[in-house]
Amino acid sequence: MDAAALAEKWREVVDNPYLRDFPFKLELNEDGKVEFAMSPATNRHSLLQGKLQALLLRCLPHGVQMPECSILTSKGVKVADVVWASDTFFERYRDATPYPKAPELCIEVASPSNTTDELTQKTRLYLEAGAVEVWIVYGDGVVEVYGPEGRRAQSLFGIAVTPLEV
C-alpha cells in the first residue's frame, strides 16, 4: 500500500467510533491492517509519558511536545508514545494525521510485553522516517538514546536523560 493510501486508511481508523475506546494503541502495518501496538497501558507507562513530556517542556521550551503521535513509516503507521517537534516541523505538518515524516525526537516507553526486536524495529523506522534521535525508556527509568549511527552515550538535544526519576 502506498503512503497516501496508508495515510487515508489511518484517518479512517482515527474517525471510526468503534475503535475509539480501546485501552491500548492501534497502529497500521504496511498493508494497512490494524495491529494492536501494545498491551493495555499501565499507570506506570502513563506516569513515564507524563514525566517525559514535562522533561521536554522544561529542557526544550521551543517546539512542541506531544503524546501518542502517529507517524507514517515504511512499515505502516506507528504511534510514538511521546515526541518533540521543532517549531519548523510543527508549522509545516501541524494537523497532518499521520505525520508524513517523523518529528525530530521520538520516544517509546517500553512495556513489559515489548520484545527487543519490536523496540529495535520501531527505532529504525522512526530514524528512517526522519527522526534525529529515538529514546527507549524502560519501566525503571533507564533511557537508551539512539541516532542513525546507533546507540549514543548522550542525547544530542543536551538533555541528561538517564535515569528518569519514577
Regions found by a protein language model. Name each.
Residues 1-166:
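Gly/Pro/Ser/Thr-rich low-complexity, intrinsically disordered segments predominantly at protein N-termini
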